[in-house]
Swiss-Prot record:
The keyword tRNA-binding does not apply. Residues 102-224 form the MPN domain. This is UPF0758 protein PBPRA0202. PROSITE patterns: MPN, UPF0758. Belongs to the UPF0758 family. CDD domains: MPN_DUF2466. Gene3D superfamilies: 5' to 3' exonuclease, C-terminal subdomain (1.10.150.20), Cytidine Deaminase, domain 2 (3.40.140.10).
Length: 224
């Protein structure tokens, strides 16, 4: 059935405008993104079908271009559109993070790092550079590796920190396996980085490991 034949209050776009985005199901939200259906399926039916094939919105968002474009109703234009939406969302979170003290909003910091790193297919090492008020100067992926490791060079972290005139750092990396527990290598490199930065009076405030739905804080565990 065409969405135009549905009562106005049941159409996803109109429902969002009158009741807000929270009132919509995943399929209805995805239908607004899709805008149109395909032969034999309206936008909501196509969205429901795609969610069943991918398993979740998260899996759809994390799909690479090749996998994404294999599905009917999706293609390079939709993939580019989705990546733009994801990037805008991440930049919004980063802007919000920069507006405050990361130590007074630890949950927001966790949420930002989770959104940024959780679904990466390769291990990446990310650094938040902070000023003397613990406000974010910048955040950067400094190293990217394979599915289970990333080579990290403390000298490069020190160099970049001095370039930003940072006073403190928050380190983070993901475990694509989904398990957020640190390895012995994680513990060693964190101590090496912390010691190297201490020589130039820069503190490591925390190191987060991002897994599948969980984040482990070195500071909270007493490892820093």
């Amino acid at each position: 059935m065409s969405l135009k034949l549905l009562p106005e209050e049941s159409r996803p776009r109109e429902k969002l405008l009158t009741r807000g985005a929270k009132a919509l199901s995943d399929a209805e939200l995805l239908a607004i993104f899709l805008r149109t259906g395909i032969k034999g399926m309206n936008a909501v039916e196509l969205a429901t079908h795609l969610l069943a094939e991918f398993g979740s919105l998260r899996a759809l968002f994390a799909a690479d271009q090749t996998l994404f474009c294999l599905h009917k109703g999706l293609g390079p234009a939709k993939y580019a559109q989705l990546q733009a939406i994801i990037e805008m969302s991440q930049r919004h979170l980063e802007e919000t993070l920069k507006e405050g003290d990361v130590l007074t909003s630890p949950q927001h910091t966790r949420h930002y790092l989770s959104q940024l790193l959780r679904d990466r297919q390769r291990e990446v090492f990310y650094v938040l550079f902070l000023d003397n008020q613990h406000r974010v100067i910048a955040g950067e992926v400094l190293f990217e590796g394979t599915i289970n490791s990333a080579a990290v060079y403390p000298r490069e972290i020190v160099k970049r920190s001095l370039e930003f005139n940072a006073v403190a750092l928050i380190l983070a990396h993901n475990h694509p396996s989904g398990v957020a527990e640190p390895s012995q290598s994680d513990l060693r490199i964190t101590r090496t980085i912390s010691d190297a930065l201490a020589l130039v009076d820069i503190r490591v405030l925390d190191h987060f490991i991002v897994g599948d739905g969980e984040i482990v804080s070195f500071s909270e565990q007493g490892w820093l």
